[in-house]
Regions:
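Membrane-interface helix-loop-helix junctions at transmembrane boundaries of multi-pass membrane enzymes
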Residues: 104-109
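Alpha-helical transmembrane segments of multi-pass integral membrane proteins
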Residues: 3, 9, 139-171
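Juxtamembrane non-transmembrane "cap" segments at the membrane-aqueous interface
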Residues: 124-143
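Hydrophobic alpha-helical membrane-insertion segments
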Residues: 41-47, 113-127
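Transit-peptide-like, low-complexity N-terminal presequences
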Residues: 1-31, 183-191
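Interfacial loop at the N-terminal end of multi-pass membrane proteins
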Residues: 20-91, 97-100, 137-148, 152, ...
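Transmembrane alpha-helical segments in integral membrane proteins
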Residues: 92-103, 164-183
């Protein structure tokens, strides 16, 4: 009987195909996990960082430094980084919203889109307001505010805007949780 050395390679082809499909499936599953991880990390870093800073660091700074004015000069620096983190997180949220568009229900889809749009608009506002407030602050030779009334007005707008942005962020995160909960439920089986 004639044996070809090509025969074993032909017999192994189906095994290779199934191995390739398993690898492809594993990569796809892990990409989903990576996406969820990145979204959760963005939530934790930006919204979590903002919540901790506003709820703990600022009040403690006021207590230790003796007033809002002193902590304001620290806040001026920190909020620049919060805005950078906000732009990064909002970019991640936008990608997640696009990738979730087909799999989410109409109410969740539109809530994600509306909250994202509002957060982006507010982020743009904060980025514009920040240098306007900075120009009213003098750092040398001693820390001072040039125009108290104008600064207070801008600062008040800034605080209201960040509060609305944070609230929109919480609604957005809730919608992400709804999507994750739906993904983790087993699909119903037909009898």
């Amino acid at each position: 009987m004639f044996h070809s050395s090509a025969a074993p390679a032909i017999e192994q082809q189906p095994a290779k195909l199934s191995r390739v499909s398993r690898i492809t499936r594993t990569v796809a599953d892990n990409l989903g996990a990576v996406r969820v991880f990145v979204v959760i990390a963005a939530i934790a870093f930006w919204l979590g960082g903002f919540t901790f800073y506003a709820g703990v660091a600022v009040p403690m700074g006021v207590e230790v430094l003796g007033g809002h004015r002193a902590i304001g000069f620290v806040t001026e620096r920190v909020t620049n980084w919060l805005n950078v983190a906000g732009v990064a997180a909002l970019t991640i949220f936008a990608g997640n919203t696009l990738l979730s568009w087909r799999t989410s229900g109409k109410a969740v889809r539109w809530t994600l889109l509306i909250t994202l749009a509002l957060m982006v608009l507010i982020e743009v506002e904060l980025i514009v307001l920040h240098p306007m407030m900075d120009r009213l602050m003098v750092f040398q030779p001693r820390r001072d505010i040039i125009d108290e009334d104008k600064f207070e007005l801008l600062h008040h707008v800034y605080l209201i805007s960040t509060t609305v942005q944070w609230f929109m962020g919480m609604i957005h995160v809730w919608c992400i949780c709804v999507l994750l909960q739906k993904r983790s439920q087993p699909e119903p089986r037909l009898a």
